[in-house]
């Protein structure tokens, strides 16, 4: 009888301790506010993955999360007012000016790097080098022979450059004018359309010159090179007297660098735990490239790829929300 009582007491104590432990865990998971944290979605696969990853991790911590479709550059108006809260990918290559202007107001905060490094530039398949001798040096594009090699019925005698969607920015129209390139900029309607055209041209060995970025699967799948423009400096974009054209800015290539997280400055006060998790979020180019490949080439959904990553990396993301 005495032994059984002790046994029951031990079981009771263990269960009580477990319940208390669970209760403490749930208490820690309670969000500082039940208002939804609004993360912005854009129009390329990698950003959809990054944002859904962050959303799922925040949900694990008990936060209410809402995903909101928003224009890549115009979103800063919503981030400044607090109508939108976090943008998970602001690329140094295309968004630096808008980000700097927003953070200068004090209403938007740079929440640190994502861990990924951005590269965006004009890109061509290597089979085009024979038709445009001198590549990858950008000077080759100034010749009539190269313009003709990259021309289409709609742009001839000018060459055709396929840029990203207009909402991405990037200053390609300005670059063509500043460098006096005999090319016409045609903007793809979507990220998917951009790379569908690359796939079609590559299979036919047809002429194509387009915007390619990394992290992405395209530079790994296709054999090609980025055009080497004059190296970017801040002065190139801000001071017309800099560079080969003394009268115009943007006479250089795109900047390379970080992919940043940005958000409404009020996030750290309203949701301090979520703020810390967003700051801690980090993923590298190889991981992201592999996930983009799963979606774009293997036909998996963003949600499935994100769920797989969450399942395999609990030790990692749990550190972000502890």
Whereabouts are the PLM-identified features?
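Pocket-flanking alpha-helical
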Residues: 51, 68-107, 197, 217-222
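A bilobed periplasmic-binding-protein/Venus flytrap-type ligand-binding module shared by bacterial periplasmic
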Residues: 119-131, 257-270, 293-294
């Amino acid at each position: 009888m005495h032994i059984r009582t002790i046994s029951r007491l031990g079981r009771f104590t263990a269960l009580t301790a477990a319940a208390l432990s669970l209760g403490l865990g749930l208490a820690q998971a309670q969000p500082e506010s039940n208002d939804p944290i609004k993360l912005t979605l854009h129009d390329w696969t990698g950003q959809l993955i990054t944002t859904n990853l962050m959303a799922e991790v925040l949900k694990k911590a008990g936060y209410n999360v809402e995903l909101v479709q928003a224009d890549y550059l115009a979103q800063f108006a919503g981030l400044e007012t607090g109508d939108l809260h976090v943008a998970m990918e602001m690329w140094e290559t295309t968004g630096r000016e808008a980000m700097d202007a927003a953070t200068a107001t004090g209403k938007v905060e740079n929440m640190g790097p994502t861990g990924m490094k951005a590269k965006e530039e004009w890109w061509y398949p290597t089979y085009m080098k024979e038709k445009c001798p001198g590549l990858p040096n950008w000077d080759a594009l100034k010749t009539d022979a190269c313009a003709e090699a990259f021309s289409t019925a709609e742009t001839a005698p000018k060459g055709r450059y396929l840029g990203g969607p207009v909402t991405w920015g990037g200053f390609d129209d300005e670059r063509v004018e500043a460098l006096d390139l005999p090319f016409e900029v045609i903007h793809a309607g979507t990220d998917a359309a951009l790379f569908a055209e690359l796939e079609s041209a590559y299979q036919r060995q047809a002429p194509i010159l387009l915007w390619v970025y990394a992290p992405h699967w395209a530079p790994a799948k296709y054999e090609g090179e980025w055009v080497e423009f004059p190296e970017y400096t801040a002065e190139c974009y801000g001071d017309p007297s800099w560079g080969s054209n003394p009268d115009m800015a943007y006479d250089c290539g795109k900047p390379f660098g970080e992919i940043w997280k940005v958000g409404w400055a009020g996030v750290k006060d309203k949701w301090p735990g979520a703020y810390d998790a967003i700051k801690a979020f980090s993923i590298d180019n190889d991981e992201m490239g592999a996930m983009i490949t799963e979606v774009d080439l293997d036909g998996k959904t963003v949600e499935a790829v994100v769920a797989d990553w969450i399942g395999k990396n609990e030790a990692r993301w749990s550190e972000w929300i502890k």
